[in-house]
């Protein structure tokens, strides 16, 4: 009897360990195939460093194929355009159809820049560190900014769910400017949709509020919480600050020469399109074992 075929969608910090551990547990009797949109692995936690030039792209990426082949794991570098859950197959951008017995979804999210007009690095006015490509664009914009320093706005957009990297980047950004003796020319404002500093989308972690407020003060970074960015224009961000009841507290018009704002996330299109698989934001509904309920 032939063994099962397990397909892992995504080759990031979730997908790669999943593939390795499945192979170690299942041995050679079952086949494992990893499918990823690009042929390289990117170590996402280092993106904030790349965005200010503290790391080179080559230091935080590596080719996926050779790493998986050493373990006897097949690899396909192609975007997935459709998941046929009923037919147990995925369709690739090049037209190929890959059948599976079990599917592991580890694609990561899609960045929903379209939810705030004028945001994002592709046709918008804010930078991102969500991918290595975005971090590279952020670095190029940062180098242009250094030629004519001015105000900077860093933070997270409405609907964002990953706030830690925004704080990390704010401190890295401030430190790099200090090293260049330019910090005094760059007033920094931290704008976040969190109800308070250090909430992190988790209701706080220990004394994260006190620690992060203290560090922001130490770095001379002002902040606006409960912030709803409504629009971004060239050199200007429009922000509505809300009170605890969700009512408008104050309207802000923030000038900037550089801005890095983490976007809200949604499920990637191929995953979100599967009927009954996801919630309205496109994230997979799971049980206590992280298995799909579908």
Task: Tell what function each PLM region has.
Residues 2-74, 158-203:
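Beta1-alpha1 glycine-rich phosphate/pyrophosphate-binding loop at the start
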Residues 107-181:
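Glycine-rich dinucleotide-binding loop and its adjacent helix/turn
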Residues 31-33, 70-83, 98, 174-285:
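A Rossmann-like FAD-binding core segment of flavoenzymes
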Residues 67-117:
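A conserved beta-strand/loop capping segment in the N-terminal third of enzymes
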Residues 2, 112, 121-148, 255-294:
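FAD-site-proximal beta/loop scaffold in flavoenzymes
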Residues 94, 107-108, 156, 241, ...:
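Glycine-rich, N-terminal phosphate-binding loop of Rossmann-like dinucleotide-binding domains
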Residues 44-48, 116-118, 273:
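Short acidic, glycine/proline-rich loop/turn micro-motifs
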């Amino acid at each position: 009897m032939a063994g099962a075929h397990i397909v892992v969608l995504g080759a990031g910090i979730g997908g790669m360990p999943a593939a390795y551990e499945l192979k170690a547990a299942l041995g050679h009797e079952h086949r494992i195939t990893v499918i990823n949109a690009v042929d390289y692995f990117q170590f996402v936690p280092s993106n904030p460093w790349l965005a200010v030039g503290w790391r080179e792209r080559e230091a935080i990426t590596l080719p996926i194929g050779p790493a998986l082949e050493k373990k006897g794991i097949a690899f396909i570098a192609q975007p997935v355009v459709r998941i046929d859950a009923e037919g147990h197959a995925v369709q690739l951008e090049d037209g190929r159809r890959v059948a599976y017995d079990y599917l592991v979804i580890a694609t990561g999210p899609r960045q929903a820049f379209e939810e705030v007009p004028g945001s994002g690095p592709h046709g918008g006015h804010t930078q991102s560190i969500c991918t290595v490509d975005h971090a590279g664009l952020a670095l190029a914009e940062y180098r242009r900014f250094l030629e004519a320093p001015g105000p900077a706005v860093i933070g997270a957009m409405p609907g964002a769910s990953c706030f830690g990297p925004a704080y990390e980047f704010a401190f890295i950004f401030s430190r790099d400017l200090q090293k260049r003796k330019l910090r005094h020319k760059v007033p920094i404002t931290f704008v976040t949709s969190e109800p308070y500093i250090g909430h992190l989308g988790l209701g706080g972690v220990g004394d994260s509020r006190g620690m992060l407020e203290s560090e922001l003060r130490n770095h001379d970074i002002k902040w606006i919480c409960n912030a709803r960015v409504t629009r971004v224009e060239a050199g200007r961000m429009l922000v509505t600050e809300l009170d605890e009841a969700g009512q408008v507290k104050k309207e802000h018009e923030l000038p900037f020469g550089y801005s890095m704002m983490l976007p809200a996330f949604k499920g990637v299109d191929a995953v979100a399109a599967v009927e009954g698989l996801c919630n309205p934001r496109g994230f997979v509904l799971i049980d206590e074992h992280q298995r799909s309920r579908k």
